[in-house]
Amino acid sequence: MKLSCGFLLILLVLSAMIATFSEVEAMKPSKPKCGLCRYRCCSGGCSSGKCVNGACDCSGRSDLNDELEKYQ
């Protein structure tokens, strides 16, 4: 009886640890997609960057901010 209670206790602790780890992994933010231009991954939002491997890359597109200022 003691052996089965100990085994159940260990099983319960392990399942609680796995559940906690799964929640922590699910709460990690994912990389912003370029389609979500409201997400500010660059200084001017995603529209000031370019899409590289499904993520916003902020290098090389600062000219868009200058063009926007000229337009306004």
Curated annotation (Swiss-Prot):
Q: Where in the cell is it found?
A: Secreted
What highest taxon heads this organism's lineage? Eukaryota
List the Gene Ontology MF annotations in alphabetical order: potassium channel regulator activity; toxin activity
- Disulfide connectivity for this sequence is 34-42, 37-58, 41-51, 46-56
| Tissue expression from the record | Expressed by the venom gland.
Q: Which GO terms describe its cellular component?
A: extracellular region
User: What InterPro entries does the record point to?
Assistant: Scorpion_toxin-like_sf
Task: Give the signal peptide range.
Answer: 1-30
Prosegment residue ranges? 60-72
The UniProt keyword set, sorted, is: Disulfide bond, Ion channel impairing toxin, Knottin, Potassium channel impairing toxin, Secreted, Signal, Toxin, Voltage-gated potassium channel impairing toxin
Family in the record: Belongs to the short scorpion toxin superfamily. Potassium channel inhibitor family. Epsilon-KTx 01 subfamily.
Miscellaneous notes for this chain? Negative results: does not block all sodium channels tested and several potassium channels. Does not block the following voltage-gated potassium channels: rKv1.1/KCNA1, rKv1.1/KCNA1, rKv1.5/KCNA5, rKv1.6/KCNA6, rKv2.1/KCNB1, hKv3.1/KCNC1, and Kv7.2/KCNQ2. Does not block the following voltage-gated sodium channels: rNav1.1/SCN1A, rNav1.4/SCN4A, hNav1.5/SCN5A, mNav1.6/SCN8A, and DmNav1/para.
Domain observations: The presence of a 'disulfide through disulfide knot' structurally defines this protein as a knottin.
Summarizing the function annotation, the protein's role is: Potassium channel blocker. At 3 uM, this toxin blocks voltage-independently voltage-gated potassium channels rKv1.2/KCNA2 (25%), hKv1.3/KCNA3 (27%), rKv4.2/KCND2 (25%), Kv10.1/KCNH1/EAG1 (15%), Kv11/hERG (12%), and Shaker-IR (10%). On hKv1.3/KCNA3, the IC(50) is 17.1 +-3.3 uM.
Write down what this protein is called: Potassium channel toxin epsilon-KTx 1.1
